[in-house]
Amino acid sequence: MGLIFSNEHEECVRELTESRTMGSVPFGGRYRLIDFPLSSMVNSGINEVGVVARGNYQSLMDHLGSGKSWDLSRKRDGLFILPPFGGSAGAPGRVGALASCGRFLKKSKEEYALLMGCDTVCNLNFRDLLARHAETGADITVVCRRGKVPEKMADPAVYTVGPDGRVSGMLISPDAPGGCCYDLGILLIRRDLLIRLVGDCVSRNLYSFKRDLLQRNLASLRVYAYEFGGFARTVCSTVAYFDANMALMDPAVRAELFDPSRPIYTKVRDDMPARYGLGASVSNSLVADGCVVEGRVENSVLFRGVRVGKDTVVQNCVILQDSVLGSGCRLNYVIMDKNVVIKNDRLLFGFQSYPVFIAKSSVV
């Protein structure tokens, strides 16, 4: 079974999650962040998936629906939305979220539980992870990446990994050098062990998953690391979100992330193809269905339904769904949320390390 935490680390991209969950943050022209963990699970044969929601999950439910787009609309197993009970946001952290969906965990008949958030963009084959877990006889297998910890990553866990792959040490939010093994927030564990560990933490009023569940039990459990060397970007800041979208301009990244043998599924919206005016010019950009381009677009990501007026120049921008840009505008290093209107002849300039953000439904 799989469990996806749709609200984790929302504070890192507060501009984008003010009215939506982390899981429903748009990405890559037509996707949402939750599409990547959900598709990876489905492609790996996981047919029972629970999505833990804490708040602002209306857009998430609209996107997921019955799970039909991921072949999870079925009589047995399928997709389950797990909102908080009693109208409250529930206990804090991943442990609190697991405690709130304890009935779902106990009801499942699956042997293993795969836990992950929505803030890491990657396309993982979890069959390889399960094979590694069984081969090592691990109680817990954590997915990690070797390299420099992303800047502004929330409470990063850094592991000390032995030659056999066993985790012998764990530091949280250290001043770690490059080349360390840091956590991607993905974990495989036996379902019955997870229920026991969560119950033990809750009974002691301990709600930090990394400190209280993992770090505290590191000596008594067999914890192994699975190093993922493919493309993975953690959305831990607005700049990181911008950079992750810009990374899609690289054909090698697109080929790996959107591997036809492990497709990324999403909700299908019936739109007309993108339309280009006589004076339009588009280079090195991702332009989604439904766009109307009459100006110049360079090195940018345009989501569905975006309109670019005549003589408008868009460079190094991420323009979300149904936004309208008037004529004669100049935009460079701008992140624009949904349904924004930019009037004629406006000039908006940011920088690669500090892109300008325009909030949802704003008029500039």
Could you tell me what each predicted segment is?
Residues 1-6, 192-193, 200-364:
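Left-handed beta-helix
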Residues 1-247, 358:
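Unchanged
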